[in-house]
UniProtKB/Swiss-Prot annotation:
One of its GO terms (molecular function) is S-ribosylhomocysteine lyase activity. HAMAP family: LuxS. It comes from Vibrio vulnificus (strain YJ016). This is S-ribosylhomocysteine lyase. It catalyses: S-(5-deoxy-D-ribos-5-yl)-L-homocysteine = (S)-4,5-dihydroxypentane-2,3-dione + L-homocysteine.
C-alpha cells in the first residue's frame, strides 16, 4: 500500500496549534489545490473532545470560508482528522501559512461569539449524522485554547522522517 504524505512527517516533533502545507498539486487545467494540516493539539499528547470537534466542524468551515475565501482562494472542504488532533483543509489556490493562521485566529474569535447551541449551523437530524453529539461549551474551550497559545507554522522539511526510519516502520 502506498505511504500517504501525512505519514512521512514526524508527529512527535509537530507543534500545535500550527498550520502545515500537507500537499500541493495541480489539476489538469492548471489550478493549484493545496491541502493544509491545521493541527489543534500536539499528536499523541492531547485530543479534541468528540463533542467539541464535532461542533467545531459545523462552525469552523463557515467561519474559515468567511475569512479566507477570495479572488484567488476557494475552500473545498474542511474535515476533522480521525486522530482528533485537528482538521484537514483542501482548497483551490495557494494562500500563505500566515494567511491561513490569520483566518484560523479570526474563526476562533467567531466561535467564541456564538451565543447558544441553537445557533450552530445544520444541527438537526436532517443535516447532521449525530445531531446529539455537540457541545458549544467544549468548542468554545478549544477556541480559547487556540487563541491563548497562538498559531505557529510546521514545515515539512523540519518534520520529514528519514528514509531509513520509514523503511523500518513499514508494515508489510
Amino acid at each position: 500500500m502506498p505511504l500517504l504524505d501525512s505519514f512521512t512527517v514526524d508527529h512527535t516533533r509537530m507543534h500545535a496549534p500550527a498550520v502545515r502545507v500537507a500537499k500541493t498539486m495541480q489539476t489538469p487545467k492548471g489550478d493549484t489545490i493545496t491541502v493544509f494540516d491545521l493541527r489543534f493539539t500536539a499528536p499523541n499528547k492531547d485530543i479534541l473532545s468528540e463533542k467539541g470537534i464535532h461542533t467545531l466542524e459545523h462552525l469552523y468551515a463557515g467561519f474559515m470560508r468567511k475569512h479566507l475565501n477570495g479572488a484567488s482562494v476557494e475552500i473545498i472542504d474542511i474535515s476533522p482528522m480521525g486522530c482528533r488532533t485537528g482538521f484537514y483543509m483542501s482548497l483551490i489556490g495557494a494562500p500563505s501559512e500566515q494567511d491561513v493562521a490569520s483566518a484560523w485566529t479570526a474563526s476562533m474569535e467567531d466561535v467564541l461569539k456564538v451565543e447558544s447551541q441553537n445557533k450552530i449551523p445544520e444541527l438537526n437530524e436532517y443535516q447532521c449524522g449525530t445531531a446529539a453529539m455537540h457541545s458549544l461549551d467544549e468548542a468554545k474551550q478549544i477556541a480559547q485554547n487556540i487563541l491563548a497559545a497562538g498559531i505557529s507554522v510546521n514545515k515539512n522539511d523540519e518534520l520529514a522522517l528519514p528514509e531509513a526510519m520509514l523503511k523500518e516502520l513499514k508494515v508489510d
